[in-house]
Amino acid sequence: MPDLLWDDVKSLFDPDANGTLPDVVVEGTTEDWQVLLDLVQSQGWQYAYSLSGEPELPSAADMVAAASADATPELRVWPVPDVLVIFRVYQAESIDFDVDLRELQGQERLDVLVYVLRSIGKRLGKSVLMTPEGSPDHPALGFDVEADRAVLMVDPIDPGVFSDE
């Protein structure tokens, strides 16, 4: 049985209510960017790195150095065709990425998201949290490293669950 069922979480995947590009983050990752790059390559996921334009992935140190020089390196990854994950290097201390809710409709696509979150979380040994676009203090779901599974962190039926009130 899947970690998350579409019928239980589909309200969280409404782009009109929660923004098109929810934020996903792994905190405390100073040494983990290279592990992420190695994961992308070992999984055989398609990717494109947009800062240097070179077909090979740079080292994590090069990506973090570019971010420190007021650039925002962007790594676009397709774990499956038609599902894009966009990693942006803002700082070494966290791995930040976006997914497009329009691409994640239905159980099959939810399972792809859970697979990506689980793959990253297990490889890094850290939890991976997804929040509505622009609401970093309101995690909706994620991979819980201690539970070793994807978990729902809010009541998806409560329409005020993401408000700051």
What feature does the model see in each segment?
Residues 7-18, 85-91:
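Short, flexible, solvent-exposed loop/turn segments with mixed acidic/basic and small polar residues
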Residues 1, 102-165:
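Acidic, proline/glycine-rich low-complexity IDRs
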Residues 23-25, 48, 74-76, 86, ...:
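Ordered hydrophobic segments in well-structured contexts
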Residues 25-80:
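Short, well-structured hydrophobic secondary-structure segments
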Residues 12-32:
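Terminal, regulation- and interaction-focused segments at domain boundaries
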Residues 16-23, 90-101:
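Glycine-rich, often proline-containing surface loops adjacent to acidic residues and nearby aromatics
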Residues 1-7:
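Sequence termini and other peripheral, non-core segments
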Residues 66-91, 146-165:
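Aromatic/basic-lined ligand-recognition segments
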